[in-house]
Every structure is written in structure tokens, then in C-alpha cells.
Amino acid sequence: MILSGKEIKNRLNKDIFIEPFSDNQLNPNSYNLRLHNELLVYENNVLDMKKENKAKKITIPEEGLLLEPGKLYLGRTIEHTRTEKLVPMLEGRSSVGRLGLFIHITAGFGDIGFSGFWTLEIFCVQPIRIYPNIEICQIYYHNIEGEYEKYTSGKYQNNTGVQPSLLFKDFE
């Protein structure tokens, strides 16, 4: 079952933590998250799953940044979230998707206990200008049934910014 917007607000600072929080970003069954001004792009055209892939930092200026199709941009949310006893899910906003902008490729699923900023895998189908601070995606919450182990030590837990892939650590 998905929580309503009112239930998300009722659970704030209990088992849902969103910082900063604004009532203006609350929806009937989700909460809009905003795009930070920092992006990462990989430096190599060919990426290797078994190796750390170098990335360079780009800052989105207030006047916007033109994204190129066929290029992966890693961004992050302004909001830091933490979730207990619920499964957090991330989706793009339909208004953003209708412009041909994807905000996650496969990683829209969070773990119970995840704490950090959400890294966004941003990809566009045609050139598009993006801006910092826009409400780019939404988080929503599912109840979980049965016993579970809390997520506390994953490689992306307690991140402090945009996270490139750390898949290479699985091979160590």
C-alpha cells in the first residue's frame, strides 16, 4: 500500500525524514524532490564495471545547462531523506518525462533504513535545458510485510553528494 500525502506528513520525523521539507512540495501520494546544482559526468566513453570510472563535476548555472542526448548525467536531490519501516521509491514527475527527460534508469527503489541524498541517473532523448532547484522527481512510500533487516551499511548509505557507480567494489 502506498502512503497518502497526508500520511507522509503525519510520519515526518518519526519514520520518514525529509530535510528540508516544504508543504508546497507535498502531493496527494508523494513528495517532490528538487535537483541540486551539482552533476557528474563520466570522463570515458567506455565504462568498465570492474573498475572505478573517473567522473568530472559540472555545476548547473542559474541560467540553466543544456543537456546532450546519449550522455549520462549523475545528479542528486537537494533533499536528504531517511526512511524507517517503509520502502521508499523514486519516480520522475510526469511533466519532466513529457519533455523526454529520464531521472533514473534502474535505481528508483530504496531500502528500508536508507539515509542520504538520492543520486539521479539523468538522460535525455533530445537536447533540453535544465535548471537547479527544479522539482524533478517524487518520492513515495510503500508499507512492507514480514520481517526484514534494516539497511545500514550499503555502499551508498550516508552519502554526502552525487554518487558515481561503486559496482567495482562488488569485485573486491
From Swiss-Prot:
Residue numbers marked as site, Important for bifunctional activity: 108-109
Pathway where this protein functions: Pyrimidine metabolism; dUMP biosynthesis; dUMP from dCTP: step 1/1
Keyword Hydrolase carried by entry: yes
Reaction equation(s) it catalyzes: dCTP + 2 H2O = dUMP + NH4(+) + diphosphate
GO biological process, one term: nucleobase-containing small molecule interconversion
Residues of the active site: 121
GO molecular function, a single term: dCTP deaminase activity
Any Pfam family: DCD
Enzyme Commission code: 3.5.4.30
InterPro entries in the record: dCTP_deaminase (IPR011962), dUTPase-like_sf (IPR036157), dUTPase_trimeric (IPR033704)
Record's subunit section: Homotrimer.
Job of this protein: Bifunctional enzyme that catalyzes both the deamination of dCTP to dUTP and the hydrolysis of dUTP to dUMP without releasing the toxic dUTP intermediate.
Protein's name according to its UniProt entry: dCTP deaminase, dUMP-forming
Originating organism: Hathewaya histolytica (Clostridium histolyticum)
Classification lineage: Bacteria, Bacillati, Bacillota, Clostridia, Eubacteriales
Gene: dcd
